[in-house]
């Protein structure tokens, strides 16, 4: 399972959707990246493959960052994805 997270302006919590296949996750990630570059479409609606009725609609102008990572099964000792300043 792969997670795609959207960091929004003035929001401490990201929005996330899941994809079952790496190819699908990469395709969505690239679509979001292109939308951020172009600013078009203004409104994006994204659905989640894990939770069928989960849909989010966001204004592209409110998205700060997009990140994609593989969801791990283990809960112990895992750090949150992204960049870390730990030594």
Swiss-Prot record:
InterPro entries xref list: UPF0367 (IPR020885)
Family according to the record: Belongs to the UPF0367 family.
Name of this protein: UPF0367 protein Pro_0144
Organism: Prochlorococcus marinus (strain SARG / CCMP1375 / SS120)
